[in-house]
Design a protein with these regions (language model features):
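Acidic/polar-rich alpha-helix caps and helix-coil junctions
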Residues: 1-137
């Protein structure tokens, strides 16, 4: 929580109009994310976008408090690493399903455990006899 407040102090102005920079607490983070709708795993329109996506962590469990803190942390990482291609590792680690809405085309759905998310082994490793990671067609 201290690191998150440090991040806020570096990235947010002390005040803007009548708003002032918040000091994050577990209660304030919980209140904010409890008030947000969870984004459906299969979005149909941009109106359904939001900061709260269902988490399905692979290999570990998280309680409600940890989930709300992770929502906040993931949003901070999303802002911090925008356009750097680093969000995909968080998507895989926390099992976040998402939808790409494309103008004039059918949406692309990426679900938890989607085989398209497995990084393929290098060609020389496959040629040496190791079985490649499975793919969906």
């Amino acid at each position: 929580l201290a690191d998150m407040n440090t991040w806020v102090s570096v990235h947010c102005a002390p005040s803007s109009g009548t708003a002032t920079r918040p000091t994050l607490t577990i209660a304030s983070i919980k209140a904010f994310f409890d008030s947000q709708e969870t984004v459906p795993e299969k979005m149909e329109s941009k109106d359904q976008m939001g900061v709260k996506k269902a988490l399905h962590p692979q290999g570990f469990t998280i309680d409600e408090t940890q989930t709300n803190l992770l929502y906040a942390l993931l949003q901070m990482r999303r802002l911090e690493t925008c356009m750097q291609g680093l969000r995909f590792m968080d998507i895989k680690r926390y099992g976040i399903a998402f939808t790409h809405l494309l103008d004039g085309e059918n949406p692309i759905y990426f679900k938890t455990g989607d085989l398209r998310g497995a990084l393929q082994l290098p060609g020389d490793v496959i040629e040496a006899g190791m079985e490649p990671n499975p793919r969906e067609n």
